[in-house]
Amino acid sequence: MIIHFTLNGAPQELTVNPGENVQKLLFNMGMHSVRNSDDGFGFAGSDAIIFNGNIVNASLLVAAQLEKADIRTAESLGKWNELSLVQQAMVDVGVVQSGYNDPAAALIITDLLDRIAAPTREEIDDALSGLFSRDAGWQQYYQVIELAVARKNNPQATIDIAPTFRDDLEVIGKHYPKTDAAKMVQAKPCYVEDRVTADACVIKMLRSPHAHALITHLDVSKAEALPGVVHVITHLNCPDIYYTPGGQSAPEPSPLDRRMFGKKMRHVGDRVAAVVAESEEIALEALKLIDVEYEVLKPVMSIDEAMAEDAPVVHDEPVVYVAGAPDTLEDDNSHAAQRGEHMIINFPIGSRPRKNIAASIHGHIGDMDKGFADADVIIERTYNSTQAQQCPTETHICFTRMDGDRLVIHASTQVPWHLRRQVARLVGMKQHKVHVIKERVGGGFGSKQDILLEEVCAWATCVTGRPVLFRYTREEEFIANTSRHVAKVTVKLGAKKDGRLTAVKMDFRANTGPYGNHSLTVPCNGPALSLPLYPCDNVDFQVTTYYSNICPNGAYQGYGAPKGNFAITMALAELAEQLQIDQLEIIERNRVHEGQELKILGAIGEGKAPTSVPSAASCALEEILRQGREMIQWSSPKPQNGDWHIGRGVAIIMQKSGIPDIDQANCMIKLESDGTFIVHSGGADIGTGLDTVVTKLAAEVLHCPPQDVHVISGDTDHALFDKGAYASSGTCFSGNAARLAAENLREKILFHGAQMLGEPVADVQLATPGVVRGKKGEVSFGDIAHKGETGTGFGSLVGTGSYITPDFAFPYGANFAEVAVNTRTGEIRLDKFYALLDCGTPVNPELALGQIYGATLRAIGHSMSEEIIYDAEGHPLTRDLRSYGAPKIGDIPRDFRAVLVPSDDKVGPFGAKSISEIGVNGAAPAIATAIHDACGIWLREWHFTPEKILTALEKI
């Protein structure tokens, strides 16, 4: 069929299949703003176009409908080197993070302002209701529209976007646009899917329909015979190597319990066979031709089921220890299933697979018996949480190709260096023959720390020599991605009558699902990032992680902290009620203070025993709680309005800024001959603005404009090693490495500048904009670099920095919530939510606020509406965004505020600490305690639903 239509003002004539999907058609025409986030359901809005004057999801159209149509995409909004009014406002406000659906947002907002000059909040919400944004938190979009409206009348107009910090510094703590925001909002090619070549093969995966089963027969011959099928990978022809999908520093503190393909299926969606074909259509047809038979086994679905004496064993294969094998290993292995498979454990992590225990750890300080004996009151409560999904707008994706004898991996990953190490080992190549290019990442939130499809894609290319694309569908994100661990946490508190704690005990049990990636470290962070908030002389913790047959779990922003913090905050609030003490008052009586030793952290390691006891070197909780109390009007009356009851709640929170004594970051900075700089950073910017942090840190040290600094990051051929984007390590680790590299280069510039000026080094200094200034005059960075590169020069000037540390930098914060609960219907309305956070010196204030809003809204979603649900046989019923319940713009609190409260930390660069993760840690307990304040019930399992409200009120 030949169709005629207008695209961004230009007439088009195309020969198409009448039923061809318009999103795919436009993307293949180079309209990279029209992206697919939700398998064509039109829920996410990443595929928004203007179709005959109306905003429409391109995925919901077929090619035949384009006949005589007028189509506009986000590519029409500005020129290639010039942003439109709305695009510029988005960049200036700092709303662009991962950027994947920001072109669609720009198009929708532009259309709104073309129709309505000054839209109301309700009109804004309606216009953006079809867009799914997982990272920005929506609140800043109101600022975008406010700024765009103001600039329509006055192009120079400004609004208050974010406060500034540190008057003693030039660029740190000041507004500066995110360095990659412009190309993202313009939809310039920067994601993995934008790099795929026309000759690329496609992988489609046949997945297990059973939660627990053995493959008894597998025949792929018919699939292999289908024209266009290039290769089929199964357990019969994949590498016989065991690994963990968790992208962590070696030796990994997780069981190496995964083979690329195995004989045993451990969850619905587990890998059976991968078809590599010339097209997606051929690959999908080939999947139907694979003949497979299973012996279905009873699944293990919960922590309690995994603990049962007669529980099926999820990992029944023999275990091999690299070091520290237990005395019982030989006996345990004598009872193992002999299928030619095994598991490897690098060092003792408390794993007992025959008992379905993937990992465990115990520790304590003080005398627990004495602590509880000294208590006037003792309470013990158990709290449960469900499985939640990260839902990045860009699903997992990888594109691999050969470049001569080298394997090139274009990846949407948080850990390019760990990915290279793992893939090289699996495909049998040396690391220097594997080149990982971290493209822009359309959202990760922890899930892209795990290596979930890259190794299959790489192996397919190595076997066939062909370029290969492997991209998850949204359904695969739910059944084959890693989600947040299910947890069951029991807290026992002893306290005096005044509420001061005498003993704290936490039993943290986690459900890791079918594989043990992060099975030690995520649950360890439950107590590690909650117990230190309330220092006590007598503390005991037990962490036990169980295998099961639910869909996989792994890294998710917060990394165990939300579960532990919910339990300790709720238990303390229940203690306060029993003692008739105000919740905020009991927090004040027990909370951590600046400079205080965090003794319990001397007993909790993250894959390694602690070497010292850290302290809260910087902590702004006193000011945070003062401001929060005032903002929420904590003690003011809460009038009842019919069935609606008002309540207020609070939770304090903390996080780390990297993993001391385990992780490392490196950086190199090169002075160019015109006085500009190129930074080669190993860090992985996944939308958090790390490249902008590195830019500003280098500019601050080198006294040059930030625009004179260009950052190359996350590319294993063009940067130095960095552990990657996890553990909130970007600013402190990658940032400090950049600071050290800049300081190293600064000394070289000063030395050679002094020589050129004929002055002692002690008499010269760097000065903005990019000069060495002495008593006799000054010389530009460009002149110094040029002299170095002449035939008689001293060579190129390069600075390097390597950062390791034994020290912690802890960000702190508090969440305040006000809810209205309808005691007749059970409806919960979140009217106010305030997130106040101490991230030290905010390097990029507007980006920091965006990080807080996004993380906090994800936490609100986990608390109010999100859950992966299963049937009794282990089939996940939640397989798309429509049924999952992640919040959109209409779901945010009416009064939603993020506040930066600074402190000065000695570990982070220029006093900075992390910001991206801590925001997810406190919403659930703040909301739950507000619900209790409203109607007197304790919800000990989250998320919170009207049904749970009415059940607790004994109305159903």
What residue ranges belong to the model's regions?
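Signature of N-terminal electron-transfer/Fe-S-associated modules in redox systems
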Residues: M1-A162, V171, Q390
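Glycine-rich loop/linker segments at domain edges
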Residues: G94, K174, D180-Q186, G247-P251, ...
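Intrinsic disorder at enzyme termini
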Residues: A105, L128-V192, Q627-G628, S635-P639, ...
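Flexible, low-hydrophobicity surface segments
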Residues: V149-G340
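Extended active-site and interfacial segments that coordinate phosphate-rich ligands
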Residues: K183, K288-E295, P299-M301, Q414-W417, ...
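C-terminal catalytic domains of large/alpha subunits in multi-subunit enzymes
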Residues: L236, G428-H435, V463-V468, K497, ...
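Conserved beta-strand/loop scaffold segments within soluble protein domains that form the structured core
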Residues: Y294, L419, K438-R440, F445-N538
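Helix-loop-helix junctions that connect adjacent transmembrane helices in secondary transporters/permeases
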Residues: P318-V427, H593-T676, K696, I804, ...
